[in-house]
Amino acid sequence: MAIRKLGPVTPASRYLSYSKFEEVTKSTPEKSLLAPLKKSGGRNRAGRITSRHKGGGHKRFYRIIDFKRSKDNIPAKVAAIEYDPNRSSRIALLHYADGEKRYILAPKGLKVGDVLHSGDKVDIKVGNSMPLKNIPLGADVHNIELKQGKGGQMARSAGAFATLAAKEGDHATLKLPSGEIRKVRIECRATIGGIGNDDHENIVLGKAGRSRWLGIRPQTRGMAMNPVDHPMGGGEGRSKSGGGRKHPKSPWGQLAKGLKTRNKKKASSKLIVRGRKAK
Protein backbone atom coordinates (compact mmCIF):
# COMPACT_ATOMS: atom_id res chain seq x y z
CA MET A 1 0.00 0.00 0.00
CA ALA A 2 1.23 3.47 -0.90
CA ILE A 3 0.26 6.70 0.83
CA ARG A 4 -0.19 10.04 -0.90
CA LYS A 5 0.57 13.20 1.09
CA LEU A 6 -0.95 16.52 0.09
CA GLY A 7 0.84 19.85 0.09
CA PRO A 8 -0.19 22.86 2.24
CA VAL A 9 -2.66 24.25 -0.30
CA THR A 10 -5.23 24.67 2.50
CA PRO A 11 -4.83 24.38 6.29
CA ALA A 12 -6.65 21.02 6.18
CA SER A 13 -4.39 19.56 3.50
CA ARG A 14 -1.13 20.55 5.23
CA TYR A 15 -0.71 17.19 6.98
CA LEU A 16 -3.49 15.20 5.28
CA SER A 17 -2.63 11.85 3.73
CA TYR A 18 -4.62 8.99 2.24
CA SER A 19 -4.19 5.60 0.61
CA LYS A 20 -3.63 5.37 -3.13
CA PHE A 21 -5.70 2.14 -3.18
CA GLU A 22 -3.22 0.61 -5.63
CA GLU A 23 -3.95 -2.92 -4.42
CA VAL A 24 -7.74 -2.54 -4.88
CA THR A 25 -8.83 -4.13 -8.17
CA LYS A 26 -12.63 -3.80 -7.99
CA SER A 27 -14.72 -0.77 -6.99
CA THR A 28 -18.18 -2.34 -6.62
CA PRO A 29 -18.85 -5.04 -4.00
CA GLU A 30 -20.39 -8.48 -4.60
CA LYS A 31 -24.14 -7.90 -4.02
CA SER A 32 -24.80 -11.43 -2.75
CA LEU A 33 -22.34 -10.84 0.11
CA LEU A 34 -23.80 -7.54 1.36
CA ALA A 35 -26.07 -7.01 4.36
CA PRO A 36 -27.77 -3.83 5.64
CA LEU A 37 -25.94 -2.03 8.45
CA LYS A 38 -28.04 0.19 10.70
CA LYS A 39 -26.25 2.94 12.59
CA SER A 40 -26.62 2.96 16.37
CA GLY A 41 -25.08 6.36 17.11
CA GLY A 42 -23.47 4.73 20.15
CA ARG A 43 -26.91 4.11 21.74
CA ASN A 44 -28.30 0.88 23.18
CA ARG A 45 -31.87 -0.34 22.69
CA ALA A 46 -33.05 1.95 25.51
CA GLY A 47 -31.72 4.96 23.59
CA ARG A 48 -28.97 5.73 26.09
CA ILE A 49 -25.40 6.50 25.02
CA THR A 50 -23.20 3.50 25.88
CA SER A 51 -20.29 4.39 23.58
CA ARG A 52 -19.45 8.07 23.39
CA HIS A 53 -18.14 10.01 20.38
CA LYS A 54 -20.02 7.96 17.77
CA GLY A 55 -22.60 9.16 15.27
CA GLY A 56 -23.14 10.24 11.68
CA GLY A 57 -20.76 9.08 8.99
CA HIS A 58 -21.27 7.82 5.47
CA LYS A 59 -23.89 5.15 4.85
CA ARG A 60 -22.39 1.65 4.58
CA PHE A 61 -23.30 -1.90 3.73
CA TYR A 62 -21.79 -4.71 5.78
CA ARG A 63 -19.59 -7.14 3.83
CA ILE A 64 -20.15 -10.72 5.05
CA ILE A 65 -16.65 -12.04 5.81
CA ASP A 66 -15.77 -15.74 6.11
CA PHE A 67 -13.78 -15.86 9.36
CA LYS A 68 -14.24 -19.63 9.74
CA ARG A 69 -12.66 -20.73 6.42
CA SER A 70 -14.71 -23.92 6.71
CA LYS A 71 -14.82 -25.00 3.03
CA ASP A 72 -12.13 -27.66 3.26
CA ASN A 73 -10.22 -29.13 0.32
CA ILE A 74 -12.07 -27.02 -2.28
CA PRO A 75 -9.73 -24.68 -4.20
CA ALA A 76 -10.68 -21.00 -4.31
CA LYS A 77 -9.38 -18.48 -6.82
CA VAL A 78 -8.82 -14.85 -5.79
CA ALA A 79 -11.13 -12.86 -8.08
CA ALA A 80 -10.61 -9.36 -6.65
CA ILE A 81 -9.11 -7.29 -3.84
CA GLU A 82 -11.67 -4.80 -2.51
CA TYR A 83 -12.00 -1.89 -0.09
CA ASP A 84 -14.14 -2.50 3.00
CA PRO A 85 -15.42 0.61 4.83
CA ASN A 86 -16.09 -1.41 7.99
CA ARG A 87 -12.47 -2.40 8.73
CA SER A 88 -8.91 -1.19 8.28
CA SER A 89 -7.79 -4.18 6.18
CA ARG A 90 -8.66 -4.94 2.56
CA ILE A 91 -10.85 -7.93 1.69
CA ALA A 92 -10.42 -10.54 -1.04
CA LEU A 93 -13.27 -12.04 -3.08
CA LEU A 94 -12.85 -15.80 -3.54
CA HIS A 95 -14.52 -17.88 -6.25
CA TYR A 96 -14.66 -21.52 -5.13
CA ALA A 97 -14.51 -24.40 -7.59
CA ASP A 98 -18.10 -25.39 -6.69
CA GLY A 99 -19.40 -21.91 -7.64
CA GLU A 100 -19.72 -20.33 -4.19
CA LYS A 101 -18.33 -16.84 -3.53
CA ARG A 102 -16.93 -15.65 -0.20
CA TYR A 103 -15.01 -12.70 1.22
CA ILE A 104 -11.90 -13.18 3.37
CA LEU A 105 -9.44 -10.77 4.97
CA ALA A 106 -6.74 -10.00 2.39
CA PRO A 107 -3.26 -11.07 3.60
CA LYS A 108 -0.14 -9.13 2.64
CA GLY A 109 1.16 -10.28 -0.75
CA LEU A 110 -2.10 -11.84 -1.98
CA LYS A 111 -2.75 -11.21 -5.69
CA VAL A 112 -5.64 -11.71 -8.09
CA GLY A 113 -5.38 -15.16 -9.64
CA ASP A 114 -3.84 -16.87 -6.60
CA VAL A 115 -5.44 -20.18 -5.59
CA LEU A 116 -6.12 -20.72 -1.87
CA HIS A 117 -7.04 -23.81 0.16
CA SER A 118 -8.24 -24.56 3.67
CA GLY A 119 -8.11 -27.85 5.55
CA ASP A 120 -5.97 -30.06 7.77
CA LYS A 121 -3.22 -30.82 5.27
CA VAL A 122 -2.69 -27.93 2.87
CA ASP A 123 0.47 -26.16 1.72
CA ILE A 124 2.16 -23.56 3.94
CA LYS A 125 1.28 -20.64 1.69
CA VAL A 126 0.07 -17.09 2.35
CA GLY A 127 -3.73 -17.12 2.57
CA ASN A 128 -4.14 -20.83 3.31
CA SER A 129 -6.03 -21.75 6.48
CA MET A 130 -5.28 -24.76 8.70
CA PRO A 131 -5.15 -25.88 12.36
CA LEU A 132 -2.26 -24.53 14.44
CA LYS A 133 -0.93 -28.07 14.96
CA ASN A 134 0.02 -28.23 11.25
CA ILE A 135 1.71 -24.81 11.09
CA PRO A 136 5.52 -24.71 11.54
CA LEU A 137 7.07 -22.84 14.46
CA GLY A 138 8.08 -19.25 13.74
CA ALA A 139 5.36 -18.74 11.12
CA ASP A 140 3.36 -15.51 11.05
CA VAL A 141 -0.41 -16.08 11.19
CA HIS A 142 -3.60 -14.02 11.35
CA ASN A 143 -7.36 -14.54 11.83
CA ILE A 144 -6.74 -16.90 14.76
CA GLU A 145 -9.55 -18.81 16.46
CA LEU A 146 -9.91 -18.79 20.25
CA LYS A 147 -12.51 -21.55 20.16
CA GLN A 148 -12.49 -24.34 17.57
CA GLY A 149 -15.08 -23.71 14.84
CA LYS A 150 -16.09 -20.26 16.09
CA GLY A 151 -14.07 -18.36 13.49
CA GLY A 152 -11.01 -16.14 13.74
CA GLN A 153 -11.05 -13.49 16.46
CA MET A 154 -7.42 -12.35 16.89
CA ALA A 155 -5.00 -10.49 14.56
CA ARG A 156 -7.58 -9.20 12.07
CA SER A 157 -6.77 -5.48 11.61
CA ALA A 158 -4.49 -3.89 9.01
CA GLY A 159 -0.85 -4.98 9.32
CA ALA A 160 -1.56 -7.37 12.21
CA PHE A 161 0.01 -10.80 12.63
CA ALA A 162 0.86 -13.19 15.46
CA THR A 163 3.92 -15.44 15.63
CA LEU A 164 3.65 -19.14 16.49
CA ALA A 165 6.27 -19.48 19.24
CA ALA A 166 5.78 -23.01 20.62
CA LYS A 167 3.62 -26.14 20.62
CA GLU A 168 3.29 -28.17 23.79
CA GLY A 169 0.65 -30.81 24.46
CA ASP A 170 -2.83 -29.58 23.55
CA HIS A 171 -1.84 -25.92 23.26
CA ALA A 172 0.12 -23.66 20.92
CA THR A 173 1.81 -20.51 22.24
CA LEU A 174 1.37 -17.33 20.21
CA LYS A 175 2.93 -13.89 20.47
CA LEU A 176 0.11 -11.48 19.64
CA PRO A 177 0.36 -8.00 18.05
CA SER A 178 -0.22 -6.39 21.47
CA GLY A 179 2.85 -8.15 22.90
CA GLU A 180 0.74 -10.58 24.90
CA ILE A 181 1.92 -14.19 24.89
CA ARG A 182 -1.04 -16.54 24.98
CA LYS A 183 -1.86 -20.23 24.68
CA VAL A 184 -4.51 -21.46 22.22
CA ARG A 185 -5.78 -24.99 21.56
CA ILE A 186 -3.84 -26.56 18.68
CA GLU A 187 -7.11 -27.58 16.95
CA CYS A 188 -7.96 -23.89 16.44
CA ARG A 189 -7.42 -22.55 12.94
CA ALA A 190 -5.29 -19.70 11.71
CA THR A 191 -4.39 -18.28 8.30
CA ILE A 192 -0.79 -18.10 7.08
CA GLY A 193 0.76 -14.62 6.70
CA GLY A 194 0.02 -11.18 8.06
CA ILE A 195 -2.85 -8.85 7.17
CA GLY A 196 -2.13 -6.42 4.33
CA ASN A 197 -2.59 -2.63 4.18
CA ASP A 198 0.12 -2.23 6.83
CA ASP A 199 0.60 1.49 6.09
CA HIS A 200 -2.86 2.21 7.48
CA GLU A 201 -1.36 3.40 10.79
CA ASN A 202 0.54 6.16 8.95
CA ILE A 203 -2.56 7.84 7.49
CA VAL A 204 -3.28 11.32 8.89
CA LEU A 205 -6.93 12.39 8.71
CA GLY A 206 -5.90 16.06 8.53
CA LYS A 207 -9.25 17.69 9.30
CA ALA A 208 -12.27 17.30 11.56
CA GLY A 209 -14.64 16.68 8.67
CA ARG A 210 -12.82 13.51 7.68
CA SER A 211 -13.41 12.11 11.17
CA ARG A 212 -17.12 12.90 10.77
CA TRP A 213 -17.21 10.96 7.48
CA LEU A 214 -15.99 7.96 9.48
CA GLY A 215 -18.71 8.37 12.13
CA ILE A 216 -16.38 9.77 14.81
CA ARG A 217 -17.78 12.71 16.82
CA PRO A 218 -15.70 15.31 18.70
CA GLN A 219 -14.20 14.57 22.12
CA THR A 220 -14.35 17.14 24.90
CA ARG A 221 -11.65 17.02 27.58
CA GLY A 222 -12.95 16.40 31.09
CA MET A 223 -10.81 19.27 32.38
CA ALA A 224 -12.74 21.66 30.11
CA MET A 225 -16.10 20.63 31.63
CA ASN A 226 -17.92 21.74 34.77
CA PRO A 227 -17.73 19.67 37.98
CA VAL A 228 -21.31 18.49 37.45
CA ASP A 229 -20.32 16.90 34.13
CA HIS A 230 -16.95 15.32 34.93
CA PRO A 231 -14.79 14.48 37.99
CA MET A 232 -11.94 16.51 36.46
CA GLY A 233 -14.09 19.55 35.68
CA GLY A 234 -14.14 22.97 37.34
CA GLY A 235 -11.45 25.11 38.92
CA GLU A 236 -9.82 28.29 37.69
CA GLY A 237 -7.84 27.70 34.50
CA ARG A 238 -6.18 24.32 34.07
CA SER A 239 -6.59 23.32 37.69
CA LYS A 240 -5.48 19.87 38.80
CA SER A 241 -5.84 20.35 42.56
CA GLY A 242 -8.89 19.62 44.67
CA GLY A 243 -12.27 18.18 43.80
CA GLY A 244 -10.89 14.81 42.77
CA ARG A 245 -8.87 16.28 39.88
CA LYS A 246 -5.45 15.16 41.11
CA HIS A 247 -5.61 11.80 39.32
CA PRO A 248 -7.06 11.39 35.80
CA LYS A 249 -10.49 9.76 35.92
CA SER A 250 -13.21 8.59 33.57
CA PRO A 251 -16.54 10.48 33.52
CA TRP A 252 -17.81 7.91 36.05
CA GLY A 253 -14.98 8.42 38.54
CA GLN A 254 -12.84 5.38 37.73
CA LEU A 255 -9.07 5.91 37.61
CA ALA A 256 -8.21 6.35 33.94
CA LYS A 257 -4.51 5.48 33.77
CA GLY A 258 -3.13 2.10 34.78
CA LEU A 259 -6.12 0.67 36.68
CA LYS A 260 -6.58 -3.01 35.84
CA THR A 261 -10.22 -3.76 35.05
CA ARG A 262 -9.98 -7.41 33.95
CA ASN A 263 -11.81 -9.90 36.19
CA LYS A 264 -9.16 -11.87 38.10
CA LYS A 265 -11.42 -14.95 38.19
CA LYS A 266 -11.75 -15.15 34.41
CA ALA A 267 -11.11 -18.75 33.29
CA SER A 268 -8.96 -17.77 30.30
CA SER A 269 -6.43 -15.97 32.55
CA LYS A 270 -4.52 -19.23 33.00
CA LEU A 271 -3.88 -19.29 29.22
CA ILE A 272 -2.14 -15.89 29.24
CA VAL A 273 1.57 -16.56 29.74
CA ARG A 274 2.54 -12.88 29.73
CA GLY A 275 0.25 -9.87 29.68
CA ARG A 276 0.49 -7.19 27.02
CA LYS A 277 1.71 -4.62 29.55
CA ALA A 278 4.25 -6.88 31.29
CA LYS A 279 7.85 -5.64 31.21
UniProtKB/Swiss-Prot annotation:
Intrachain S-S bonds: none
Pfam families: Ribosomal_L2, Ribosomal_L2_C
GO molecular function: rRNA binding; structural constituent of ribosome; transferase activity
Gene3D superfamilies registered for this protein in UniProt: 2.30.30.30, Nucleic acid-binding proteins (2.40.50.140), Ribosomal protein L2, domain 3 (4.10.950.10)
Any single GO BP term: cytoplasmic translation
SUPFAM superfamilies: Nucleic acid-binding proteins, Translation proteins SH3-like domain
Entry's Gene Ontology cellular component terms: large ribosomal subunit
Chain intervals with Gly residues compositional bias: 232-242
Chain intervals with Basic residues compositional bias: 40-55, 259-279
Keywords on record: Ribonucleoprotein, Ribosomal protein, RNA-binding, rRNA-binding
Positions of region (Disordered): 34-55, 221-279
NCBIfam families: rplB_bact
PANTHER family: LARGE RIBOSOMAL SUBUNIT PROTEIN UL2M, RIBOSOMAL PROTEIN L2
Family the entry assigns: Belongs to the universal ribosomal protein uL2 family.
Reported function: One of the primary rRNA binding proteins. Required for association of the 30S and 50S subunits to form the 70S ribosome, for tRNA binding and peptide bond formation. It has been suggested to have peptidyltransferase activity; this is somewhat controversial. Makes several contacts with the 16S rRNA in the 70S ribosome.
Subunit structure: Part of the 50S ribosomal subunit. Forms a bridge to the 30S subunit in the 70S ribosome.
Name the record gives this protein: Large ribosomal subunit protein uL2
Source organism of this protein record: Chlorobium phaeobacteroides (strain BS1)
Taxonomic lineage: Bacteria, Pseudomonadati, Chlorobiota, Chlorobiia, Chlorobiales
